[in-house]
Regions:
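Pepsin/retropepsin-fold aspartyl endopeptidases
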Residues: 1-131
Length: 131
């Protein structure tokens, strides 16, 4: 599978890369989301308007450390996420007012078998090891 860059649903903007995906909740409601690919984020994040629109409910709460060292507690749920490069079921942080834009974190990338190349700013299929 070739690397996916311009022309393959990754949008670039001065050192920042985005990918468009579709999230689906447990009742089948869907939303199209433009995710910031954030290889520094563990979990993906959905804004409150999106997760409420697709009918997600909190399953548990987790503590997170932000880039500035601040700790926050956020609810976490799960949804189906489809990208042009693959799809699967993934945990997502349920964003609160004032939280970041939609983020695509490394747990989701690993679940989908993808890795982000920060130098070329493209998604590649992951080279999986079976050991």
């Amino acid at each position: 599978m070739p690397a996916l860059g311009a022309g393959h649903s990754i949008f670039r903007s001065v050192g920042i890369s985005y990918v468009q995906g579709t999230v689906r909740g447990p009742g089948g409601a869907e939303a199209t989301v433009r995710f910031l690919i954030d290889s520094g984020a563990t979990y993906s994040l959905l804004p409150e308007s999106v997760w409420q629109a697709i009918g997600l409910v909190p399953k548990r709460e987790m503590d997170f450390v932000l880039a500035d060292g601040t700790s926050v507690r956020r609810p976490v749920s799960e949804c189906h996420l489809a990208l042009p490069q693959g799809e699967g079921h993934t945990p997502v942080v349920l964003g609160q007012p004032g939280d970041a834009e939609p983020l695509l974190g490394v747990v989701t990338l690993e679940i989908l078998g993808l890795v982000f190349d920060p130098f070329r700013r493209v998604l590649h299929p992951m080279r999986a090891l079976m050991v």
